[in-house]
């Protein structure tokens, strides 16, 4: 199939340039003004911005095992609606992808249902228990984007050391959910701060995150493993990672849109404000933005975590942990970081597309020769975030009702038109 994206605006060295992008059999074959390219599908992109497709290294697509929350089909459609062309799917599934046979179940679903590039993680431990026997990383590494027990922390230094050694030997990466449950009281639901104390809700202290990060940095220094910290939420975590990078430790990290734009001051006693890790203090939020700007935080990942309406209808105490975010990430960050002057647009694109692509060795992009990974956005849109418009099964977002000034109009992933809200010229 031959596709032409006509008259879009591409940001190059701080300047917008009107550009055509020609795609043949899923590969970018030409870029330039007024291309002569006979195409079966021509999309008029005049007035819209063209970006490399976004990459999210931390999503929960819930299949196999929990299709009432999300499916590969609905989740990948939601990703395309958000401008994403590649996502890495976390392994808290049933069965957990801890063996070749179990991984094949997920791979079959992806092959049959995904409209974008979905790459599975395998679990670090058998059954994704955070302890005990490790998965066969050497056997699985060629089929996965990395190894994670996301949703659980790896409980002991001995287990993590062995995992890092095996992961390094397999030339893969560990994406670590850093949470030490010994710090968290029964029923811990939100940050251990003013809101928790005022409402009598058990709080989750910052130590539960930064203590295991501190442990793992020492192990990473020892083993040389490629190591990535998931959903960083505390100022102490940022400081530890900044220092480790200065020492040359092979470490990267991510944070999420909700941690950059919200803090515990914004909490309401609603399930859509409950996620793990929780929204922290204002000074944590400020430290995360500073870390994103100075490169300590390498990338933005949504931790898109859909649940059923019933599971999110029990307030902060009783609701399941997790919010959706894949369809709202760029509109929110563009509106509240770029338009407010807190971050250059080029940096936001790097943190959402280029940096995760580099670290996780993901192909695709918008240059000639790349596997096509392109998203088209209207940066003059005036919309309000309405969960009823989501393609995800999940509806729980803390940003419901927020005004945003960007909207995805088209997403192209390889030879697939993964999302289309543009009129097409035949």
Regions found by a protein language model. Name each.
Residues 8, 26, 47, 58, ...:
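Divalent metal-coordination and catalytic microenvironments
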Residues 1-53:
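Histidine-rich, glycine-flanked metal-binding segment
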Residues 100-117, 166-176, 328:
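Alpha-helix-loop-beta-strand connector modules within alpha/beta enzyme cores
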Residues 8, 315-318, 368-426:
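C-terminal cap of metal-dependent C-N hydrolases
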Residues 198-226, 293-294, 298-300, 305-379:
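His/Asp/Glu-enriched, well-ordered alpha-helical/loop segment
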Residues 46-113:
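Metal-associated gating/positioning segment near the N- to mid-region
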Residues 132-300:
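Histidine/acidic residue-rich metal-binding segments in metalloenzymes
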Residues 57-70, 119-131, 151, 202-206:
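Active-site mouth loops of central-metabolism enzymes
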């Amino acid at each position: 199939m031959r596709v032409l994206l006509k008259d879009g605006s591409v940001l190059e060295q701080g300047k917008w340039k009107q550009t055509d992008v020609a795609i043949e059999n899923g590969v970018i074959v030409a870029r330039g003004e007024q291309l002569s390219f006979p195409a079966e599908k021509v999309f008029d992109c005049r007035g819209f911005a063209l970006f490399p497709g976004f990459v999210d290294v931390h999503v929960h697509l819930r299949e196999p095992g929990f299709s009432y929350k999300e499916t590969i089909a609905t989740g990948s459609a939601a990703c395309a609606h958000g401008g994403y062309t590649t996502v890495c799917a976390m392994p808290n599934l049933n069965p957990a992808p801890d063996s070749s046979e179990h991984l094949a179940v997920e791979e079959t679903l992806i092959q049959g249902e995904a409209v974008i590039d979905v790459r599975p993680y395998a679990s670090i431990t058998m059954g994704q228990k955070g302890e005990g026997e490790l998965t066969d990383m050497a056997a699985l590494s060629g089929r996965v984007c990395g190894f994670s027990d996301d949703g659980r922390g790896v409980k002991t230094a001995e287990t993590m050391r062995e995992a890092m050694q095996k992961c390094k030997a397999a030339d893969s990466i560990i994406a670590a959910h850093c949470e030490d449950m010994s710090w968290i009281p029964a029923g811990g639901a939100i940050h251990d701060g003013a809101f928790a104390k005022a409402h009598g809700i058990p709080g989750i202290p910052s130590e539960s995150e930064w203590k295991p990060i501190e442990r793992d940095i020492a192990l990473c220094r020892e083993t040389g493993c490629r190591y990535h910290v998931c959903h960083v939420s505390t100022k102490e975590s940022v400081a530890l990672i900044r220092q480790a990078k200065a020492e040359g430790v092979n470490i990267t990290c991510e944070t999420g849109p909700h941690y950059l734009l919200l803090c515990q001051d914004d909490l309401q006693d609603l399930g859509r404000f409950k996620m793990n890790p929780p929204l922290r203090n204002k000074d944590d939020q400020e430290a995360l933005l500073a870390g994103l700007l100075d490169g300590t935080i390498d990338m933005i990942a949504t931790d898109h975590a859909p649940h059923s309406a019933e599971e999110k209808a029990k307030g902060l105490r009783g609701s399941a942990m997790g919010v959706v975010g894949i369809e709202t990430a760029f509109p929110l960050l563009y509106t509240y970081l770029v338009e407010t002057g807190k971050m250059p647009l080029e940096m936001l694109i790097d943190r959402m597309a280029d940096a995760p692509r580099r670290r996780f060795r993901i192909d695709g992009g918008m240059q000639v020769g790349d596997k096509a990974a392109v998203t088209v956005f209207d940066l003059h849109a005036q919309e309000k975030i309405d969960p009823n418009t989501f393609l995800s099964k999940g509806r729980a977002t803390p940003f419901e009702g927020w005004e945003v000034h960007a909207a995805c109009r088209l997403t192209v992933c390889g030879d697939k038109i993964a999302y289309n809200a543009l009129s097409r010229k035949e």
